[in-house]
Amino acid sequence: MSGACSSYVSAEQEVVRGFSCPLPGGEAAAVFCCGFRDHKYCCDDPHSFFPYEHNYMWWLSIGALVGLSTAAVVLLAFLITACVLCYLFISSKPQTKLDPGLSLQTTGSKEMSPDHHGLNTAIPMEVPGVSSPRQSSSSNTHLESNKKQTVSPTCLPQNQFMATVTASNIPGSPDEISVPTPGPHGPVP
C-alpha cells in the first residue's frame, strides 16, 4: 500500500478529493492509505480494514468467544441431560409385560383350546343374591308381579352384574379370590 489515497465518493454521495498520508495534524506513524472504496483514511498498519483501534477489536473478539463458549456449554449440558433422562426412562421400564388387570369378555360356555392354557383366563362367577344377565328376563317378570309390594328403605333395588375374575401365572398371586357375599338386603352402609 502507498501513502497516497486517491479521490473517492463517500456513502453520503459526496466526492472526497485525494490526499497523501500522513495528514497534516494527524499521527506521524499513519503513513499508509487504508479503507474501502467509499471511505479512506491514513493508518499505521497496511492490513487494517477498520478505522478503530485494535484494542476495541480484541475486546469484541474476546466477548464473542466468551458468548459462543457459554452457548456451547449450555447446549452440551442440555444434550447430556436429555440423553441421561432417556437412558433412565428406558432402563427403568420393566422387562416383562405385566397383566393389565380384569379382562372384559362375554360369558358363555365356550371351551378353551389347549394352546391357551397358562394364559390369563376369565372365569365367570355368580355372586349370591345377584342375578346374571341371562336371568334378567325372568327377574323382570318377577319384579312386575311384585309391583304392589312395598319396598323397605333398607332393601332397595340393585343393579345386576356378572363378576369376572382373572387368574394368572404371576408368582405370589393368590389362586382364588374371595368375593364377599352381600346380605339379603344388600351391603350394610
UniProtKB/Swiss-Prot annotation:
What is the name attached to this protein's record? Protein shisa-like-2A
Q: List keywords of the entry alphabetically.
A: Membrane, Transmembrane, Transmembrane helix
Q: Which GO terms describe its cellular component?
A: membrane
Principal location listed in the UniProt entry? membrane
Q: How does it sit in the membrane?
A: Multi-pass membrane protein
UniProt family annotation:
Belongs to the shisa family.
Q: Which domain of life is it from?
A: Eukaryota
Gene behind the chain: Shisal2a
